[in-house]
Structure formats: C-alpha cells, structure tokens
Amino acid sequence: MTETIDPDLIERGRKTFAGDWHFIWASPSIETLPPMDGLEVAFAGRSNVGKSSLINALTGRNALARTSHTPGRTQELIFFDGPPGAGLRLVDMPGYGYAAASKAKVASWTSLIHKFLQGRATLARVYVLIDGRHGLKDVDLDILKTLDKAAVSYQIVLTKADQVKAAELAERVDATRTALAKHPAAFPELLTTSSRTGAGMPELRAAMIRLLDERR
C-alpha cells in the first residue's frame, strides 16, 4: 500500500523522531501563533480520525499529543518542536466535521484554519488524515478544496489501516487516488498507516525528511 522510499530517508527519519519531541505552543486564534521557525507540517482530519494518536506514534511518545474519546475536543492549533537541529515542527490542527459542535464554534475553527493555511510561510505540507475504514467523506472533500484554493501542498494519509481487511483497504486506496486526480495541490503519493501497529510510520517520517531536503 505504501510506496517504497529510499532507505537513507527511512533511517534519517527514525533518528530525527527518536529525539526529544515536546509541546511548545497552543494557539486559539491567528493572533496567538508562535513565531515562524524552521519547517512546519500540519495534521488535519475529521474529529477522531486519529491525529493525536498518529503524532504520538510518530514521535514514540504516548502522551505527547492528548487523545480524547470526545470528538472535537482539540479546538486550538497545537505546536510541537523536535530535538535541536531537527528543523521541523509538527502542528495538530482542530478536527473538523463534528456534527454536535455549535455553528459559532465551527465558524471559529474554520476561520482559524483558513487564516493559518493562507498566511504561514513556514508551512510546507498538510497531512490530511482519512479514516481507512470509511474513506473520503464530503467534509474531507471540502477541506481538500480549501487547500487547493490556498495553494497549500497536502498529502493524504489513511489511518487505522489495521482495522480494515486488505482487499477493502486496496479499494479505499484506489478510490482515494482517483478522487485526488481532481485536486491540483494534492501530493500524488498516498500513505497508509496504523498508530497501533506502527505500520506506515517509517514512510511518513521519511516523507518529512524529504521535505526538509527539498527546502534546504
């Protein structure tokens, strides 16, 4: 499911994410964003798609990003820095598509996300997490259109791959690739992951190292 990646990138990704990753900032509004520093990659997705679990699995720190069984709990942009010299920062974005949230709250989150996407020069890529059990939903497609409009590079990451039969996952990957052909800002490579088993994490880490190389 996941593309073959240069072993050197895999190893460099392993070393980078084996270092000390830590929380540095929480921004409830665009006015409270931290100073731009290094390269930023953000994680977006529907509420309870597994963003926090994926960040924890990436960094090997079970409690780095707070996980919650309450959809829509993350209402801020959460920033994490890596070890000295990593040059990489992770951003956990508010979950979207939570039907029980008030209209005012949804409007506030939407405004924050849009402003962040359009005005952050250090933002290199957004990883859009899609639940591998369900595939793309209308609300996901809306976010992809927003990213296209903002001209922000993004890449699809299918989560919870361990909870889907192989044949179903293959169908989900094919359907997602077909849908992405209509989106100009989408990075063509699709990743499949499992935070529980660690599947796909080496490839995702390597993808970020490749981004760092491209920006240097």
UniProtKB/Swiss-Prot annotation:
The keyword GTP-binding applies. The keyword Metal-binding applies. InterPro entries: G_ENGB_dom (IPR030393), GTP-bd (IPR006073), GTP-bd_ribosome_bio_YsxC (IPR019987), P-loop_NTPase (IPR027417). Its cofactor is Mg(2+). One of its GO terms (cellular component) is cytosol. Keywords: Cell cycle, Cell division, GTP-binding, Magnesium, Metal-binding, Nucleotide-binding, Septation. GTP binds at residues 45-52, 72-76, 92-95, 159-162, 193-195. CDD domains: YihA_EngB. Mg(2+) binds at S52, T74. Residues 37-214 form the EngB-type G domain. GO terms for biological process: division septum assembly. PROSITE patterns: G_ENGB. GO terms for molecular function: GTP binding; metal ion binding. Belongs to the TRAFAC class TrmE-Era-EngA-EngB-Septin-like GTPase superfamily. EngB GTPase family. Necessary for normal cell division and for the maintenance of normal septation. NCBIfam families: GTPase_YsxC. This is Probable GTP-binding protein EngB.
